[in-house]
């Protein structure tokens, strides 16, 4: 089990909170809540040791060319594929975008 932390430049804080997925379904749970302006902070708890570079590359591809909202994101991973990670993050971003 490993805990990884990542930070990326961001815009203004997101408007809401969201919980998408669950560890037992797709092997991934993502919690999103408003963060500090200008900073997107991500904490990943994963069962896959030595996966920091995979996570770093996934986030870099996801945020490339855009300014995400300032959020605190907690990810609980039990071996999800990169496609599932991206899907859950996109679902979370959509959820916090609704009024």
Swiss-Prot record:
Keyword set includes Cytoplasm: yes
GO terms under cellular component: cytoplasm
Subcellular location: Cytoplasm
Changes after translation: Covalently binds the prosthetic group of malonate decarboxylase.
InterPro entries to which the protein is assigned, alphabetical: Mal_deCO2ase/Cit_lyase_ACP (IPR023439), Malonate_deCO2ase_dsu (IPR009662)
Modified residues annotated as O-(phosphoribosyl dephospho-coenzyme A)serine in this record: 25
Keyword Cell inner membrane set for record: no
Gene Ontology molecular function: acyl carrier activity
Keywords, ordered alphabetically: Cytoplasm, Phosphoprotein
Entries under Pfam families matching the protein: ACP
Function: Subunit of malonate decarboxylase, it is an acyl carrier protein to which acetyl and malonyl thioester residues are bound via a 2'-(5''-phosphoribosyl)-3'-dephospho-CoA prosthetic group and turn over during the catalytic mechanism.
NCBIfam families for the chain: malonate_delta, PRK01220.1
Family according to the record: Belongs to the MdcC family.
Name of the protein described by the UniProt record: Malonate decarboxylase acyl carrier protein
Taxonomic source organism: Pseudomonas fluorescens (strain ATCC BAA-477 / NRRL B-23932 / Pf-5)
Lineage: Bacteria, Pseudomonadati, Pseudomonadota, Gammaproteobacteria, Pseudomonadales
